[in-house]
């Protein structure tokens, strides 16, 4: 590699670490102060097909010149040469016939063909037409034999003449190409891979030299022809199933038509289909003097088929509604289908005596196939049928669903006979039109509807639209009946509507789907710009769609923004990334994922994810109304990553390990059923992975050799995969709903009355008069459907509230060290499960007693007390005077850390209790107490309090669970009550408590309290799953072992103290941040509120007597205690005479998404229900920064967006902004008005410097920063962008990356180092800025342009930015004065007028709000930035 280029950024320079600010993203539309013309995207003008006429006329003129000079001219192979000023066009002469005598001696040729096939009758006509015409159209019904026989007829004819013959036959599907080739080989007794062979993707049989008949997929032939730009390597090209009109087929037709006239006139082209539009294809392939002939091959049906339309069924009493013109199933549609089922049943029942077939036999062979447009309609139809069957027991129906997301086992049910005496009714989507044939279907009910995917090329958002099916679709559906007996088809539209209003054919894919791959093929063809090529398609797309596609390809780096250095809206030079993308059978963003995987040395992971994203239904889905087990399988495989794509990678890894272990077929199927994995899809994915690996190897895109450089460890890989996902799917960026509102965390805790939101959900609609504490166990049982055991749940109530609070108990450490379902952040898994329960069913019935009966019940059973007509349930609260909790007046306390689980959970014994604890220990270890041996292991149950040996002494303990026995010796897991640690203790180390000991100590609260580190949280860079890094825990353990520890109490919430630990080396909390093991974090609302109270109490401590301090502290602790679960035995159900419906459960952490794209700003965003993020919660509620979600695809319906293939990005402050800066085509980073800080980023494709209008405004993205981004960050990002470009900075003639392994290692090591530096910074917070002109590109011509090593050939050009100005001293003094004023109001006890914190741009409505605002990390950072220090 050029040393000057490698030295461009002087990478050898040593960088000193410094705290740097970070960026924050918001997609909140309210970020705009007011709505202006600039705040909404301009509607792009639709440019239609006017461009086509000029191009087609030019093409006709060219074709005429070619035809006129056909016999005398020589061939030129490019459009520019052919369309020259020369009067005479050069063409290649027709070659002489080539003999192949030796080849035909080598293989056996049996000329006896199957004469029973309908196609045989047309054999001579077909061969004659092929001999006499360059293009022949063959229309033959499904099953006539055209696919297998026509190529053999041609080959046999060549054999007779001893002429060379090379035939290629395309198939739209891989499996079809393989199976048909094998069938032909079997029929002709040829060794597979000799005379007849196949090729799908790069997978082909090894020896193709002797192949004369090749079956391949459409894409294989297309790629080959685009590469060689001639048809002459074949004598016959047979395009089968041309009616399907996918993009590959339409582009192949274009290429074949062009090359046939250009340089391959002797090649014969045969177009075949069962439902071909002969008129359209004849016109498209018409020569100047003639049209291609059409040969028709058909065969009669074995059993008759009768079709009925809605208006022809006069005897059925359905409502005489007018025919719907808008596609859809009306309120009566489902009922009408059921009426038809009843008519069919009655008809066969009446024919029982007149027919040779009995009624029971008719039901068995008379299955009904109902075509519905989607899964939702299938479920609705099933519910309607189910209700009718329940009401009419004699109407016996066996419902079978059939759609593409079903498991293979479920699909097999379609072919099984129904239960005895039942009629099978198959509810299906259009998958059964051609993919599945069920022999026993005798009736079809067709709603004549279908769902078609359309893509808006401007936004790149897809929408699944409900449309009327084409007549071709309906005929294919009708062809599903009458295999075993006569059949009937009922079309749920009128005959007039069917004949005169429904389209004959569907919309070609080129007119409704993304055009990226077609435009790339057009660029590779090198016969004109994309619009000139695509104008020649059979169905040319709108020019707007081509223009938008070119913009999208520029956005992903497949095209450069210029053509020969000049910007073109409709064209761009093909980049080296584009050349790679054109070689993959993938969406360009998935190809970009593979390229970035190569750059960041995680190529294999990227290949697996890309393959998994192309395969449908990797997971098996359940039907509506059921608790979807498959959903939790997504979580298991995602393993806490919050990423559907990483989940795919983990599924494949497990599958690959099973394959390598040679797991038996039965075992693999059991595994697939257990984890709801579609094994068939997984096998298809495996083939795709192998194919992509081969394609990468052919391009010299391979992983770095193991050991050549520093490889990513598991923790780093979890982040780097999200980095490349963010890069691949830019700009599909979404932000969780904005938390910048200062009232957010207060309302969060108010909603659940101070409970922990990370562990609590709530129901509504429970009136207090029902005395809820009586039904806590019944409420716990509601969660059994989510497999949450009742013993792990606390249910509490708030006086006067209709809410029921359900709090999940945290796992006792070490009980379950490998949780099955991991979730990101602090929120417990059970909260996700509870919210998912509500999504399945919002109402939960609960049986209760009326108030009078409830009063009688509690009086009779002496449960609680009744005072002033109010029931007071029994309480099990600890006496507050006995609690070992720090006083509200104590700022620091000394003592011992008795046990460390992690930095977020450890236990502390105050030094003041040392003598009392020693006295207790002495009592416990008296010989009298130690003589209470456990005689019967069954007496030791969960929750039992006893004595257990800890070290050399026995201490109080509570049993957590019974462990497995070893050699028949019982063991028990216990927690030591006064120390906090957990241990597994054998039965001989346990002692029961004597009655006296129970009386004295059973109600004594623990002699320690739980702590966590305050103002910090685990670094997302240093750890996964929001868990504390091991090294951080080791630092805390080291402090604990050193002896007496000084704790500074920040707050006390729910009996857990947030603390700062003072050591000789400084505050441990800060030390963890300095070592990048933790990052600074806000405390939540309850913690800040308690901290403020403690500060004010401690300021008045000297004025309060010791006695009053104790009384005030007890009142403080009493007030701080939350209600506890009473866990009462519920009343018998026969006494519960009322049924209420609880609504929920809800979580206050439920979040929504906002799109960051300008085109999606004012749209509602929903996450696909099968995504791991479909239950989207604020996983770090104390963190005022929000996380970004990246989506693989986006679909649109009206003003709603649905995102699929989602990935929750790491909770690294500024991550979204940094990723946008790193992977966007270009960006402008904007400053505040004083140019003292960066406040927002405008990213996109850039703008026209002459008009200042954006090139692709729909995809412009604004990111408002709330942490500081420094000039050094932009420098690092530019270095990374340069390195990414350097990985492919040149291609040789073979299109191989020219960077060698040694240079790749250097580049990767640089990238790795820079990325770690970029993400590892502890960034200071800044105030948010908003503007009405965020989407305006600014003229930055006054800036010196950055150096561009690769000039116009850079995929990632360098970013430029303004230097900071010095802060104005007057402004600093003003901000300091504002800060001083805020603090002057802090201890005010009355009401105040709203005040403005100018440091943070926040309005403070009350003194309480002001106090808590002063404690936020944002305000503390801003105080440092303006130089304010409190006296």
Swiss-Prot record:
UniProt GO molecular function: ATP binding; ATP hydrolysis activity; RNA binding; RNA helicase activity
Subcellular compartments: Cytoplasm
Ranges of residues in domain Tudor: 937-1000
Pfam families xref list: DEAD, HA2_C, Helicase_C, TUDOR
GO biological process: dorsal appendage formation; germarium-derived oocyte fate determination; global gene silencing by mRNA cleavage; heterochromatin formation; intracellular mRNA localization; mitotic chromosome condensation; oocyte karyosome formation; oocyte localization involved in germarium-derived egg chamber formation
Organism: Drosophila mojavensis (Fruit fly)
Entry-linked SMART domains: DEXDc, HA2, HELICc, TUDOR
Family under the similarity heading: Belongs to the DEAD box helicase family. DEAH subfamily.
Lineage: Eukaryota, Metazoa, Ecdysozoa, Arthropoda, Hexapoda
Domain Helicase ATP-binding span(s) in chain numbering: 127-294
InterPro entries, A to Z: DEAD/DEAH_box_helicase_dom (IPR011545), Helicase-assoc_dom (IPR007502), Helicase_ATP-bd (IPR014001), Helicase_C-like (IPR001650), P-loop_NTPase (IPR027417), SNase_OB-fold_sf (IPR035437), Tudor (IPR002999), Znf_C2H2_type (IPR013087)
Name listed for the protein in its UniProt record: Probable ATP-dependent RNA helicase spindle-E
Cross-referenced PROSITE patterns: HELICASE_ATP_BIND_1 (PS51192), HELICASE_CTER (PS51194), TUDOR (PS50304)
Residue span of motif DEAH box: 240-243
């Amino acid at each position: 590699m050029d040393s000057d280029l490698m030295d461009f950024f002087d990478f050898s320079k040593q960088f000193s670490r410094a705290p740097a600010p970070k960026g924050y993203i918001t997609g909140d539309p309210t970020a705009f102060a007011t709505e202006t013309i600039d705040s909404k995207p301009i509607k792009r003008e639709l440019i239609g097909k006017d461009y086509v006429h000029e191009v087609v006329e030019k093409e006709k003129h060219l074709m005429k010149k070619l035809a006129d000079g056909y016999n005398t001219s020589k061939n030129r192979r490019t459009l520019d040469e052919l369309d020259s000023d020369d009067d005479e066009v050069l063409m290649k002469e027709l070659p002489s016939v080539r003999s192949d005598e030796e080849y035909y001696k080598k293989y056996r040729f049996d000329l006896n063909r199957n004469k029973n096939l309908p196609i045989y009758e047309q054999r001579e006509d077909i061969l004659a037409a092929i001999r006499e015409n360059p293009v022949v159209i063959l229309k033959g019904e499904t099953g006539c034999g055209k696919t297998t026989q026509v190529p053999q007829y041609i080959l046999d004819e060549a054999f007779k003449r001893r002429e060379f013959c090379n035939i290629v036959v395309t198939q739209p599907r891989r499996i079809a190409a393989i199976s048909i080739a094998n069938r032909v080989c079997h029929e002709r007794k040829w060794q597979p891979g000799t005379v007849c062979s196949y090729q799908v993707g790069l997978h082909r049989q090894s020896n193709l030299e002797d192949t004369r008949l090749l079956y391949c997929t459409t894409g294989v032939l297309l790629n080959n022809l685009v590469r060689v730009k001639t048809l002459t390597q074949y004598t016959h090209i047979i395009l089968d199933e041309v009616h399907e009109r996918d993009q590959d087929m339409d582009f192949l037709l274009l290429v074949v038509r062009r090359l046939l006239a250009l340089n391959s006139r002797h090649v014969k082209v045969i177009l075949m289909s069962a439902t071909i539009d002969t008129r359209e294809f004849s016109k498209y392939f018409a020569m100047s003097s003639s049209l291609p002939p059409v040969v028709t091959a058909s065969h009669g049906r074995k059993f008759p088929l009768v079709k009925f339309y809605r208006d022809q069924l006069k005897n059925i009493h359905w409502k005489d509604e007018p025919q719907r013109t808008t596609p859809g199933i009306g309120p009566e549609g489902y009922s009408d289908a059921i009426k038809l089922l009843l008519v069919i049943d009655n008809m066969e029942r009446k024919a029982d005596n007149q027919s040779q077939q009995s009624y029971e036999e008719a039901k068995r062979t008379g299955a009904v196939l109902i075509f519905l447009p989607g899964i939702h309609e299938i479920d609705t139809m099933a519910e309607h049928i189910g209700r009718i069957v329940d009401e009419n027991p004699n109407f016996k129906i066996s419902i079978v669903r059939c759609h593409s997301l079903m498991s293979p086992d479920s699909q097999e049910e379609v072919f099984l006979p129904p239960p005895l005496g039942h009629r099978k009714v198959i509810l299906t989507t259009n998958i059964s039109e051609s993919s599945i044939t069920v022999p026993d279907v005798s009736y079809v009910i067709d709603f004549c509807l279908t769902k078609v995917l359309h893509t808006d090329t401007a936004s790149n958002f897809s929408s699944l639209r409900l449309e009327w099916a084409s007549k071709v679709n309906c005929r294919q559906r009708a062809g599903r009946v009458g295999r075993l007996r006569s059949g009937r088809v009922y079309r749920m539209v009128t005959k007039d509507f069917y004949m005169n209003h429904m389209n004959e054919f569907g919309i070609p894919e080129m007119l409704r789907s993304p055009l990226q791959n077609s435009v790339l093929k057009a660029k590779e063809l090198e016969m004109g710009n994309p619009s000139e090529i695509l104008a020649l398609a059979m169905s040319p797309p709108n020019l707007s769609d081509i223009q938008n596609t070119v913009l999208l390809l520029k956005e992903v780096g497949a095209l450069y923004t210029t053509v020969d250095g000049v910007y073109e809206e409709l064209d761009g030079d093909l980049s080296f990334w584009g050349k790679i993308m054109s070689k993959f059978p993938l969406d360009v963003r998935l190809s970009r994922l593979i390229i970035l995987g190569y750059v960041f040395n995680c190529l294999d992971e990227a290949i697996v994810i890309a393959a998994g994203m192309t395969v449908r239904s990797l997971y098996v889905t359940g039907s509506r109304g059921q608790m979807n087990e498959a959903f939790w399988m997504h979580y298991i495989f995602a393993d806490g990553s919050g990423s559907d794509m990483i989940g795919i990678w983990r599924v494949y890894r497990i599958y690959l390990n099973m394959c390598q272990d040679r797991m038996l077929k039965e075992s693999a199927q059991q595994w697939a059923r257990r984890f709801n994995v579609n094994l068939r899809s997984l096998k298809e994915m495996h083939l795709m992975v192998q194919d992509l690996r081969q394609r990468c190897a052919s391009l010299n895109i391979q992983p770095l050799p193991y050991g050549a450089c520093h490889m990513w460890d598991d923790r780093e890989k979890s982040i780097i995969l999200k980095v490349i996902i963010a890069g691949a799917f830019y700009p599909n960026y979404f932000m969780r709903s904005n938390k910048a509102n200062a009232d957010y965390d207060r309302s969060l805790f108010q909603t659940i009355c101070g409970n922990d939101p990370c562990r609590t959900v709530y129901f509504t609609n429970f009136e207090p008069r029902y005395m809820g504490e009586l039904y806590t166990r019944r409420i716990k049982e509601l969660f059994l459907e989510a497999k949450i055991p009742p013993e792990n749940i606390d249910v509490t109530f708030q006086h006067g509230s209709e809410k029921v609070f359900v709090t999940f108990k945290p796992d006792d450490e070490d009980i379950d060290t490998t949780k099955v379902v991991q979730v990101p952040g602090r929120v417990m898994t059970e909260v996700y499960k509870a919210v998912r329960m509500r999504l399945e069913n919002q109402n939960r019935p609960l049986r209760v007693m009326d108030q009078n009966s409830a009063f009688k019940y509690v009086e009779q059973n002496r449960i609680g007390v009744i005072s002033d007509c109010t029931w007071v349930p029994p309480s099990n609260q600890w006496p507050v005077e006995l609690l070992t909790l720090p006083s509200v007046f104590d700022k620091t306390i000394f003592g011992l850390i008795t046990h460390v689980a992690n930095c977020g959970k450890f236990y502390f014994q105050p030094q003041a209790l040392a003598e009392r604890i020693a006295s207790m220990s002495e009592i416990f270890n008296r010989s009298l107490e130690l003589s209470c041996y456990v005689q019967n292991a069954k007496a030791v149950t969960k929750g039992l309090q006893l004595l257990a040996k800890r070290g050399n002494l026995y201490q109080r303990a509570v049993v957590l669970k019974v462990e497995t026995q070893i050699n028949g010796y019982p063991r028990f897991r216990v927690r030591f009550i006064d120390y906090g640690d957990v241990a597994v203790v054998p039965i001989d180390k346990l002692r029961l408590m004597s009655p006296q000991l129970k009386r004295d100590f059973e109600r004594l609260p623990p002699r320690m309290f739980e702590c966590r580190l305050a103002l910090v949280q685990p670094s997302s860079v240093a750890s996964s799953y929001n868990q504390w890094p091991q090294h951080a825990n080791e630092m805390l353990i080291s402090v604990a072992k050193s002896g007496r520890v000084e704790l500074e109490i920040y707050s006390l919430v729910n009996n857990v103290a947030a603390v700062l630990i003072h050591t000789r080396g400084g505050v441990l909390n800060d030390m963890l941040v300095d070592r990048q093991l933790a990052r600074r974090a806000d405390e939540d609302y309850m913690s800040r509120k308690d901290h403020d109270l403690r500060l004010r109490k401690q300021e008045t401590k000297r004025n309060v007597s010791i006695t009053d301090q104790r009384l005030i502290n007890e009142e403080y602790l009493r007030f701080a205690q939350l209600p506890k679960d009473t866990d009462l035995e519920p009343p018998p159900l026969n006494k519960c005479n009322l049924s209420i419906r609880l609504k929920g459960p809800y979580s206050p952490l439920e979040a929504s998404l906002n799109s960051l794209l300008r085109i999606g700003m004012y749209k509602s965003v929903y996450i696909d229900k099968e995504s791991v993020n479909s239950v989207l919660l604020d996983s770090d509620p104390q963190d005022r920064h929000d996380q970004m979600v990246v989506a693989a695809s986006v679909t649109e319906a009206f003003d709603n967006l649905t995102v699929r293939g989602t990935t929750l990005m790491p909770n690294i402050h500024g991550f979204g902004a940094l990723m946008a800066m790193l992977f966007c085509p270009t960006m402008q980073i904007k400053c505040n008005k004083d140019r003292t800080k960066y406040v927002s980023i405008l990213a996109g494709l850039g703008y026209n410097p002459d008009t200042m209008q954006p090139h692709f405004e729909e995809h412009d993205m604004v990111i408002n920063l709330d942490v500081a981004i420094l000039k050094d960050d932009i420098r690092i990002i530019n270095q990374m962008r340069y390195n990414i470009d350097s990985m492919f900075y040149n291609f040789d003639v073979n299109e191989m990356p020219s960077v060698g392994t040694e240079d790749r290692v250097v580049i990767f090591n640089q990238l790795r180092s820079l990325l770690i530096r970029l993400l590892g910074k502890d960034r200071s917070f800044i105030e948010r800025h908003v503007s009405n002109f965020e989407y305006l590109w600014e003229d930055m011509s006054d800036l010196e342009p950055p150096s561009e090593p690769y000039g116009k050939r850079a995929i990632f050009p360098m970013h430029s930015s303004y230097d900071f100005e010095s802060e104005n001293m007057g402004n600093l003094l003003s901000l300091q004065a504002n800060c001083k004023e805020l603090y002057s109001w802090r201890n005010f006890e009355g009401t105040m007028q709203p005040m403005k914190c100018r440091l943070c741009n926040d309005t403070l409505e009350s003194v309480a709000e002001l106090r808590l605002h002063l404690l936020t990390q944002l305000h503390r950072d801003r105080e440092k930035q303006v130089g304010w220090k409190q006296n």
